Amino acid sequence: EMSASLVGSEMCIRDRSVTAYGADAESAVSDAIAEIERLDALLSTGETDSEIYKLNQNGGGSISEDTSYLLERALEIWKSTDGCFEIGIYPLMQEWGFTDGNYKVPDKETLQKLLPLADSSKIDFNEKNQTVSFEQDGMEIDFGGIAKGYTSGRIMDIFREHGITSGMVSLGGNVQVLGCLLYTSPTPRD
């Protein structure tokens, strides 16, 4: 659903919302939605055509500039948090049912088997060649802890490119704003 007026444009799809105010608001929102869809298709763990899905299935491969940037940042955060931020957690997320909604508490034996897979030190990343490989069979990554922030940052860049001075993006509860909301009615209740 998309609505536009002289002052702004807004689009809501599933749990995502993009709002922009300014002369080029409609085009900015359209470009923002296209970027959200592009990054989602690239970074999704569940879409069989996504780069991350293919990396997880093949244990590595060549990656795009966006994925390379996110992997570099994720590994930096992993190091700076002494491993508390871990992108190699995907096998554990699957076992707990977070990926398909079939939640369960795994038994201790299964968890002990999967825990060694959640270890970013076993990710071999060649920044120059934009390639990655997992040193341990069964490793899989998930950018869920960093991708929405990256995506909303890209939306803010798009807004600025379109001269937008006020806007908002909400991606499944992660919200980023630019400028301030411009009220067009005398009171907020009108």
What spans do the regions from the language model cover?
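N-terminal cap/recognition module
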Residues: S9-T45
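Internal glycine-rich flexible loops
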Residues: A23-E26, S30, L42-L182
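Short, small-residue-biased leader/transition segments that mark boundaries at the very start
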Residues: E1-C12, P186-D190
